[in-house]
């Protein structure tokens, strides 16, 4: 039964505020929770502070908070001390539904233990453009059938552990070359990109709508602000009845073109249930309340959104118990079982592109797009006696991450050239990529292998594969 709510309390339930542990503003989040926001999206933190912080917010809230985070690569993607799992593209290289479901289960177990039951994953975008600056290894791959199978399996694993998965970014963010954190991408037609959302929706308790214009559906508005996309295509066209959320409303694709308060109202008008990460949560509530009182926002629409939100909270157990068990953090988060799951996925993902292996001795040259040292990879090779300054084999370790707000992905050609100079005496070059596989297009090598992220598990797997301890059974899920 829906609790009694005032009009302001209803619209507040639609707002999901943000909190960043690296830039904490406790006064702001406390005010937002007291004002009745329906959820909070967390960034950063550690296993030592997340659960207690969430419990404090839950005790402050009149209604249970639906707490979310971007756990695309496991809870460790955001929370230090939690398990970092290999990327979706790594799972795509395995082709294994079993491993996709395992990733979903491990992610959800740790998320629930931390008090964060809304898992903002899986990414269901198709990775079809090498110059896409924001999807890349976040995707399972280029093939719609593969993405559907693995996305469904991941979501199934999340649901089995009592958490809520979120497929994103509807209607498909893969076939663009613009980062929506900075600008508004434009897509002619969703085409095959709709397939994973349509075919996986039975397993998805929520779907996130992306900030991009789809000219074939609505050439005038971003999908997040378009009733033709949200109500027309997603609800009526595909028949989706679950929770629908916007992508973060503070992103440049929205804020560069429209006032923040107006964007929140338009997103609600379009049919979104949850308005994620507005720049000003209190201002968002005020704007929604004003729109409701003026008749601009239909009360029946708001009621339907609130019912979906409350149903989601019930399904993940918040109605019965909103308080996370601190003991579960110690027992579950970052446990040996989960670390072994990460290793299992990583080892199954290693992909041989060309050439002969194993490599017994080599000089290693690190080439990165910044801030990544691949310490585990080096240490694992050193432990096996595989590092040698005198070797005539040179290993170029290529690390390239997808980062929001950068607008590009890849390694500076000048950095690549310098690394080749340092390996000038090598008779044989072996390229090993950690993350973005397209970097191999820019590197001439005699042999090459891929892992699809720089997690410790993937670094260990790459080292073991390089020296011949494990096979390379992964299959490249994109076209280079």
Show where each model-derived region lies.
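Preference for extracellular/luminal or secreted protein segments
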Residues: 1-36, 236-237, 256-480
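Second-shell residues forming the walls of enzyme active-site clefts
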Residues: 6, 31, 40, 45-65, ...
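Flexible hinge/switch segments at interdomain interfaces of large molecular machines
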Residues: 8, 79-82, 120-129, 170-174, ...
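Active-site mouth loops of central-metabolism enzymes
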Residues: 13-24, 88-102, 181-192, 250-258
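Short glycine-enriched loops at secondary-structure junctions
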Residues: 19-23, 67-77, 117-127, 167-171, ...
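Catalytic domains of carbohydrate-active enzymes, especially glycoside hydrolases
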Residues: 29-43, 105-118
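Surface-exposed, active-site-proximal loop segments in enzymatic domains
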Residues: 80-93, 129-140, 179-185
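A substrate-binding/cap region within the structured catalytic cores of diverse enzymes
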Residues: 95-116, 123-139, 144, 151, ...
């Amino acid at each position: 039964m829906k609790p009694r709510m005032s009009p302001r309390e209803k619209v507040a339930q639609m707002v999901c505020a943000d909190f960043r542990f690296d830039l904490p503003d406790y006064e702001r989040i406390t005010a937002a929770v007291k004002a009745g926001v329906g959820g909070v999206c967390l960034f950063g933190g550690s296993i030592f502070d997340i659960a207690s912080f969430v419990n404090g917010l839950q005790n402050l809230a009149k209604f249970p908070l639906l707490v979310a985070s971007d756990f695309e690569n496991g809870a460790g993607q955001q929370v230090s001390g939690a398990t970092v799992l290999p990327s979706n593209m790594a799972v795509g290289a395995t082709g294994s539904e079993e491993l996709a479901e395992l990733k979903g289960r491990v992610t959800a177990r740790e998320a629930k233990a931390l008090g964060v039951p809304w898992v903002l994953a899986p990414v269901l975008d198709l990775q079809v453009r090498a110059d896409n600056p924001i999807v890349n290894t976040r995707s399972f791959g280029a093939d719609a059938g593969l993405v559907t199978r693995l996305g469904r399996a991941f979501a199934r694993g999340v649901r089995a552990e009592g958490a809520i998965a979120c497929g994103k970014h509807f209607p498909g963010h893969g076939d663009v070359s613009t980062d929506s954190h900075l600008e508004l991408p434009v897509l002619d037609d969703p085409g095959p990109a709709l397939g994973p959302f349509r075919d996986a929706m039975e397993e998805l308790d929520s779907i996130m709508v992306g900030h991009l214009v789809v000219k074939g559906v609505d050439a005038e508005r971003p999908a997040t602000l378009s009733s033709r996309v949200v109500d027309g295509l997603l609800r009526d066209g595909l028949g989706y009845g679950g929770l629908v959320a916007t992508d973060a409303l503070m992103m440049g694709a929205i804020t560069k073109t429209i006032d923040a308060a107006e964007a929140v109202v338009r997103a609600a008008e379009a049919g979104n249930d949850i308005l994620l990460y507005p720049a000003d949560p209190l201002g968002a509530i005020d704007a929604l309340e004003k729109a409701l009182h003026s008749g601009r926002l239909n009360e029946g629409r708001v009621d339907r959104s609130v019912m979906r939100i409350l149903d989601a909270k019930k399904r993940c157990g918040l109605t019965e118990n909103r308080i996370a068990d601190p003991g579960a953090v110690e027992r579950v988060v970052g446990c040996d079982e989960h670390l072994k799951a990460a290793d299992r996925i990583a080892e199954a993902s290693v992909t041989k592109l060309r050439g002969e292996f194993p490599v017994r001795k080599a000089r290693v040259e690190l080439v990165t797009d910044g801030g990544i040292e691949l310490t585990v990879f080096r240490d694992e090779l050193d432990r096996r006696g595989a590092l040698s300054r005198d070797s005539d084999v040179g290993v170029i370790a290529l690390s390239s991450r997808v980062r929001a707000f950068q607008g590009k992905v890849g390694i500076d050609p000048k950095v690549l050239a310098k690394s080749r100079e340092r390996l000038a005496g090598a008779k044989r070059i072996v390229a090993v990529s950690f993350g973005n596989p397209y970097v191999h297009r820019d590197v001439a090598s005699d042999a090459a292998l891929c892992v699809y992220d720089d997690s410790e598990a993937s670094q260990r797997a790459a080292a073991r594969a390089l020296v011949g301890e494990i096979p390379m059974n992964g299959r490249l899920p994109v076209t280079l």
